[in-house]
């Protein structure tokens, strides 16, 4: 294979370059994509499956090599291993972008690997990875229904920016990653600072304009160097099987849909499926159990979609705009800082808020350096939530993704950390699941924050929207169930308050989703969100004014950066002494912001007093509570601040004459003194007598 390259310019200084033919020539497709000095290598490979499956076995792994920034991992193990949260989230972005572009019944095991080989700290690598993977698929022999591209959109200085730099993203009011084809959007993921629905649509349209440019370039490249597509792995369902199944189940889905409870519905559906297989299965390659199972799923899908399209009725009896019944129990757990049991239909979460000091913050390390997350939401999805037996251990990709979406939704309503200096952890423990559990996490998490007394700016709620698209007939569904998510054409999650949006995520299974459809979905989502917020308001109208008695108390104070070493002391001796003496936890950042946490206000005040003494500057005319360090015939030496000692002469002890200072004070006594002056040698002249008349 010869070396080939193509470039696409999005904006001035932002040119995407794709190369192939030099690296990984044995892969089905391999591309090195680069912008500036950020280079991402991507490969795609396919293998035939030994037996048929009813899903697309697509595996995506994205990895950021620390060598790309000239570093190695810290710690004992220097080899990249378990993926970071950022790598998992980017892998999901690539998967969700590519999966809709692959044929439904492609019976091949497909693996996508994407590596960041060079990172300049300016150009963010994830949209480059999406485009690089799409390019590798386009020129490979793996069948693809359409060419995909992806971009990031930011909002900087009141204008939209495509593939913003890291510095631009640091000040952007929106982060949107979207992927699509020349004609449609397939995936969006983002969060923003209470943007309107129309602003979100505007951002999507802006991003799609650049996606079209990339797709056209990759399409031309594919025509020029692409391999012939191998369609032998695409297996079609014999028409006679689908026809026979349709005939057998005719009229039986009506009775099935009378069952409203999820587990009972699934059991009855499985029983009917087994009956169909038992009646129609034959000893040939056509009427196999697998083909009949696929045909049954298609028949069930067609019936439920038709019911929605023609009658506006859903499988659980709701109208297209009806939200499932909601129940809310705040302060559900007695010893937590804040909690809420949030139930919407058959989806339920036990949301818990925990407050702590900076020591509780989540530490992380990626290509942009080390950091601290003082707010994080962790989503747990145990197998019992869907009545199954399963693995318990480290979180899966789905748990990471759902947790991050809910976290972003709530992050925009948090108070100023200078006014509320707590680290905040939200747990969303899913105890029942039948669709929209990530949006239940937003609602439950918000109520847990309010129950904990976190002074949020405004309540936030989330809702998942669905879509049934048949030819030109569009039906939008509010608050979709798990079945509707599976059988529908769109999963569009939207979170925000009554006025604006804070987070959104959309996955599309079909082409043809226009801006007008998204606009209608967002408008319907706003109505549903407002209804949910009203229900939440009835349960808890505003954040509690007091923190839980079990939550730590935290206060901050500012010291000069050049005084940090004084507070810490040699080898940390001084700060350890303060922590032990006052019974507190202390965190100090590089700017000199000191965070003090303790179980009581008295302990905090004691620590603040000690620190103020350490960093304070003496003032002439100020009165101090000093400690007598030594007594001499002509007076006493008194420490007025740590390390700052002066002489109180015998004549300055009393208005009456005294002959022996030892009769008046002893070493270790506390003595109130006034600083009268500081001489040219920096020595302090103190007076106890001067405080007696004041």
Curated annotation (Swiss-Prot):
SUPFAM superfamilies reported for this sequence: Eukaryotic type KH-domain (KH-domain type I), Nucleic acid-binding proteins, Polynucleotide phosphorylase/guanosine pentaphosphate synthase (PNPase/GPSI), domain 3, Ribonuclease PH domain 2-like, Ribosomal protein S5 domain 2-like
GO molecular function: 3'-5'-RNA exonuclease activity; magnesium ion binding; polyribonucleotide nucleotidyltransferase activity; RNA binding
Residues at which Mg(2+) binds: 485, 491
Reaction(s) catalysed (UniProt annotation): RNA(n+1) + phosphate = RNA(n) + a ribonucleoside 5'-diphosphate
Residue stretches making up the KH domain: 552-611
Assigned GO CC terms: cytosol
Pfam family, one: RNase_PH
Family designation: Belongs to the polyribonucleotide nucleotidyltransferase family.
Name of the protein described by the UniProt record: Polyribonucleotide nucleotidyltransferase
Organism expressing this protein natively: Chlamydia abortus (strain DSM 27085 / S26/3)
Record gene name: pnp
């Amino acid at each position: 294979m010869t070396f080939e390259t193509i470039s696409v310019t999005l904006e001035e200084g932002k040119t995407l370059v794709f190369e192939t033919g030099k690296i990984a020539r044995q892969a089905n497709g391999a591309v090195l994509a680069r912008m500036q000095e950020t280079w991402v290598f991507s490969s795609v490979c396919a293998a035939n499956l030994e037996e048929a499956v009813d899903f697309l076995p697509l595996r995506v792994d994205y990895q950021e090599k620390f060598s790309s920034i000239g570093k190695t991992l810290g710690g004992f193990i220097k080899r990249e291993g378990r993926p970071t949260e950022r790598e998992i989230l980017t892998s999901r972005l690539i998967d969700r972008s590519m999966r809709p572009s692959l044929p439904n019944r492609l019976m091949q095991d497909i693996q996508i690997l994407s590596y960041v080989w060079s990172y300049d700290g300016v150009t963010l690598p994830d949209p480059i990875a999406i485009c690089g993977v799409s390019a590798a698929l386009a020129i490979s022999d793996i069948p693809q229904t359409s060419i995909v591209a992806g971009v990031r959109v930011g909002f900087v200085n009141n204008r939209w920016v495509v593939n913003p730099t890291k510095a631009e993203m640091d000040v952007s009011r929106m982060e949107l990653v979207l992927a699509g084809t020349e004609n449609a959007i397939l995936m969006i993921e983002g969060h923003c600072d209470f943007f309107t629905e129309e602003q979100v649509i505007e951002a999507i349209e802006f991003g799609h304009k650049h996606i079209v440019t990339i797709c056209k370039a990759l399409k031309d490249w594919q025509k020029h160097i692409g391999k012939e597509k191998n369609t032998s792995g695409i297996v079609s369902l014999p028409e006679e099987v689908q026809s026979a199944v349709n005939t057998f189940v005719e009229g039986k889905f009506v009775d099935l849909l009378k069952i409203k409870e999820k587990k009972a519905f699934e059991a009855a559906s499985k029983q009917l499926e087994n009956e169909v297989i038992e009646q129609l299965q034959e000893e040939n390659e056509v009427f196999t159990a697998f083909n009949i199972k696929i045909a049954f799923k298609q028949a069930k899908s067609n019936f439920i979609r038709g019911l929605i399209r023609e009658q506006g009725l859903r499988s659980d009896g709701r109208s297209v705009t009806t939200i499932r019944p909601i129940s809310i129990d705040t302060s559900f757990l007695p010893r937590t800082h804040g909690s809420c049991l949030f139930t919407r239909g058959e989806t339920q979460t036990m949301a818990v808020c925990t407050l702590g000091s900076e020591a509780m913050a989540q530490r992380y390390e990626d290509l942009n350096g080390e950091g601290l997350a003082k707010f994080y939401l962790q989503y747990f999805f145990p197998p019992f939530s869907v009545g199954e037996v399963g693995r318990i251990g480290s979180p899966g990709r789905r748990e990471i993704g759902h947790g991050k979406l809910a976290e972003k939704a709530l992050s925009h309503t948090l108070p100023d950390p200078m006014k509320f200096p707590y680290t905040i952890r939200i747990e969303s423990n899913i105890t029942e699941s039948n669709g929209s559990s990530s949006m239940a996490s937003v609602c439950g998490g918000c109520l847990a924050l309010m129950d904990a007394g976190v002074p949020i700016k405004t309540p936030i709620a989330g809702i998942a929207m669905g879509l049934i698209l048949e030819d030109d007939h569009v039906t939008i569904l509010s608050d979709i169930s798990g079945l509707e998510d599976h059988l529908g054409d769109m999963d569009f999650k939207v979170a925000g308050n009554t006025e604006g949006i804070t987070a959104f995520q959309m996955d599309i299974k079909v082409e043809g989703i226009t801006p007008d459809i998204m606009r209608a979905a967002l408008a319907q989502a706003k109505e549903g969100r407002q209804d949910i917020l009203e229900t939440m308001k009835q349960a808890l109208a505003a954040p509690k004014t007091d923190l839980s008695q079990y939550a730590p108390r935290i206060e901050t104070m500012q010291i000069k950066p050049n005084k940090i070493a004084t507070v810490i002391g040699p080898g940390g001796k001084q700060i350890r002494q303060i922590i032990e003496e006052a019974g507190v936890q202390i965190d100090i950042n590089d700017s000199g912001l000191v965070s003090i946490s303790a179980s009581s206000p008295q302990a905090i005040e004691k620590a603040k007093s000690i620190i103020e003494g350490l960093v304070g500057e003496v003032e002439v005319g100020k009165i101090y509570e000093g400690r007598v360090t030594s007594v001499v015939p002509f007076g006493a030496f008194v420490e007025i601040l740590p390390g700052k000692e002066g002489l109180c002469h015998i004549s300055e002890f009393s208005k009456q004459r005294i002959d022996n200072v030892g009769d008046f004070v002893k070493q270790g006594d506390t003595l109130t003194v006034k600083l009268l002056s500081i001489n040219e040698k920096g020595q302090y002249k103190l007076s106890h007598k001067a405080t007696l008349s004041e």
